[in-house]
Regions:
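Structured helix-beta-strand junction loops
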Residues: 33-34, 72, 93, 124
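Acidic, PIN/NYN-like endoribonuclease modules and their adjacent C-terminal/linker elements
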Residues: 1, 103-131
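Amphipathic alpha-helical segments within well-ordered protein domains
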Residues: 48-52, 67, 87
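Regular secondary-structure segments
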Residues: 13, 28-29, 70, 84-87, ...
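Short, well-structured N-terminal submotif of metal-dependent ribonuclease cores
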Residues: 1-39, 54-61, 67, 131
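Active-site neighborhoods of divalent-metal-dependent phosphate/nucleic-acid chemistry enzymes
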Residues: 74-115
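Residues that scaffold the ATP/ADP-binding catalytic core of kinase and kinase-like folds
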Residues: 11-13, 50, 124-125
Length: 131
C-alpha cells in the first residue's frame, strides 16, 4: 500500500497543473493496481483546508469531492469510522472539517463532550463552550 501526500491529492482533485496532474494520476493508478492507496486523516484534513481556503470551494463541493475520493476503488482510510462521521457532520454543519474530526475522534473513545471556545462548533451535539 502507498500513502499519498496532500499536494498530490490536490492535483488529483483540482486538475490545475497539467504535468503534475498527469504524474499524480499515473502514480495513483499504479498504486491502486499494485497494493492500494492509504489516506491518512491529516492528509484529508489538509486537503479540505486547501480546497476551502486556496481554491475557495464551497462546503457542498468540498464534501462531494471528499466523498468521491474516499470511496474510490483501492482506497484504505485511517480511521474510516471517524472520517465518515466527520464528513457527514461537515456536510450538514457550520464548523470546520478539522473540528468535526476532533469531535468524532473523541467520540470514538468515549471522550465527550468536546470543550471549545468555538461558538459555531458549540452548536453541535456533544460540544460545549468553555465557560
Amino acid at each position: 500500500m502507498e500513502t499519498f501526500d496532500t499536494n498530490v491529492l490536490v492535483r488529483l482533485v483540482v486538475q490545475d497543473d497539467a504535468d503534475q496532474c498527469a504524474r499524480a494520476e499515473r502514480s495513483w493508478r499504479s498504486a491502486v493496481r499494485s497494493s492500494g492507496v492509504f489516506l491518512p486523516v491529516v492528509a484529508l484534513v489538509e486537503l479540505v483546508w486547501v480546497l476551502r481556503v486556496a481554491y475557495k470551494l464551497d462546503r457542498a463541493s468540498v464534501a462531494a469531492t471528499l466523498r468521491r475520493l474516499i470511496s474510490s476503488e483501492g482506497v484504505t482510510l485511517e480511521r474510516k469510522d471517524v472520517l465518515h462521521a466527520a464528513l457527514d457532520r461537515y456536510a450538514a454543519g457550520l464548523a470546520d472539517f478539522s473540528d468535526y474530526v476532533i469531535l468524532e475522534t473523541g467520540r470514538s473513545v468515549g471522550a465527550v463532550p468536546l470543550r471549545t471556545f468555538d461558538a459555531r462548533l458549540a452548536q453541535t451535539a456533544e460540544v460545549e463552550l468553555v465557560p
